[in-house]
Amino acid sequence: ESTSKVEISKELNLSMPTVLSNVKDLLEKGIIIETGEYEPTGARKAKSIGINPSYRYAMGIVITANHLGMVLVNLKYEIVKSERIRLKFVSDMSYCSQVADFAAKFLDHMNDAEQKEKLLGVGISIPGIINQEQKLVIKSHALKLENYSLSFLEQAFSVPVYFSNDANAAMMAEDMNIYQNAIYLSLNQTLGGGFCLGG
């Protein structure tokens, strides 16, 4: 949400010179932008500032038995681009090469330098029990995998890659400002679910 320098000073208990100096620095770096005018009760209008949504992006990839889904979101969790293509999962390097090729085409509006600078990371959701630390699919009925290393997929990207169970990833994608306590059910080729307590 947008705010003002005065509000930042009050909320963080900082002096105005400190706030002005930091805001100037963030504006110059493009991390924040001026978003219009801010009119708090009983005060004159001031320039409002907020996060620059296009300062950084994150990419999401959904792997299923027969499809590959891709999405790009900005810092406001707004979908900038999305695509779903038919791609049958196979457990060898040819699949990794295809995923890398499709991802490169999906991000073709960014050059290599922009991708390294602006892309924070890639989240990959997979149906099954995932060990994120070991980059391992412990078991997946949908993909017919067991104790399967995901390192080959991680190597397809030059940014951090995070793996998650598909239902858990879908739960995290929901707006937790609206749903403080929620259960997510995934009804696809297999039944899955995730839950969130207290936001």
Regions found by a protein language model. Give the residues of each.
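Gly/Thr-rich phosphate-binding beta-strand-loop-beta motif of the actin/hexokinase/Hsp70
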Residues: 45-82, 182-199
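Residues within the alpha-helical elements of helix-turn-helix
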Residues: 11
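Conserved phosphate-binding catalytic cores of ATP/NTP-utilizing and phosphoryl-transfer enzymes
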Residues: 34-56, 163-184
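Glycine-rich phosphate-binding loop and adjoining helix at the ATP-binding site
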Residues: 82-181
